[in-house]
């Protein structure tokens, strides 16, 4: 079974993954559990299926890598930096590096973010699964998930979960 590249992140109802200051404090449910699905999204189970995480320099600077000490982490950057511990800095074509990584034995690959990094993977059309948590908030402005001039990517809804107003949608490429 081949490895998959999986985008997994939260998005506001109007398509933003961070507020205009790069903040995430709006990523909360509405507190209403009346519509919760019986089966719930299990982030820890998701983490068990991956052994590699890909993130951009902004996510790295916010120290998101710290929650992935047991995983291999690739960081896309425009600078030449020395790798250390489980962190690999990629100054170049991150999509090619991750496609090469995908060919190796291992678990799935978590495309963590941010938006510019994800945009390069969308434009390369190499994301196998899209997991998006829709947060019940309209931000009005911020950092968008989807930038312009993307290819059409047809998806099939495989699963969905609702937890306190947050809807998690799990799509696979058709």
What would you call each of these model-derived segments?
Residues 1-174:
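Enzymes that bind and transform nitrogen-containing heteroaromatic metabolites
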């Amino acid at each position: 079974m081949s490895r998959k590249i999986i985008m997994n992140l939260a998005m506001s109802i109007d398509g933003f993954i961070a507020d205009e200051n790069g903040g995430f404090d709006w990523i909360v449910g509405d507190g209403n559990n009346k519509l919760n699905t019986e089966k719930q999204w299990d982030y820890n189970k998701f983490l068990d299926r991956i052994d590699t995480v890909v993130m951009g320099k902004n996510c790295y600077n916010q120290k998101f890598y710290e929650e992935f000490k047991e995983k291999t982490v690739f960081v896309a950057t425009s600078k030449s930096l020395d790798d250390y511990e489980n962190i690999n800095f990629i100054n170049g074509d991150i999509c090619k590096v991750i496609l090469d990584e995908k060919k190796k034995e291992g678990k799935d690959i978590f495309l963590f973010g941010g938006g510019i990094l994800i945009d390069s993977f969308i434009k390369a059309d190499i994301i196998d699964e899209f997991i998006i948590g829709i947060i019940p908030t309209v931000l009005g402005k911020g950092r968008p998930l989807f930038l312009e001039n993307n290819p059409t990517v047809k998806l099939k809804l495989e699963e969905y979960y609702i937890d306190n107003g947050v809807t998690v949608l799990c799509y696979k490429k058709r």
